[in-house]
């Protein structure tokens, strides 16, 4: 059983994964699209603390790489359900179920024009 599954690989999800991995937890990040989430659609991110201005897609790649460097795993799946267990949780995905001790929901937002 994994320690933590993070649903969503945007900046919030990847940051959660990074900190959980740094704490020595086994971490899996599930994302159905590209790592970085909505930040990928930003041509230039100029206000991310500690980093110079860079394209949004590059920031997403950087965050994903940092989390992976610390031991987090990324997998491309769609989560279709979440069930509490005793202990932990079961996540149903398009590739089958997964179990974990803790889950972080960081699914972000939907772009509105």
Identify the residue ranges that each predicted region occupies.
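FAD-binding core/adjacent interface of flavoenzyme oxidoreductases
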Residues: 1-7, 23, 74-113
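N-terminal Rossmann-like dinucleotide/flavin-binding domain of flavoprotein oxidoreductases
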Residues: 40-97
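N-terminal Rossmann-fold NAD(P) dinucleotide-binding loop
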Residues: 13-14
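Alpha/beta-hydrolase active-site loop signature
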Residues: 34, 43-46, 111
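Glycine-rich FAD pyrophosphate-binding loop
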Residues: 5, 21-41
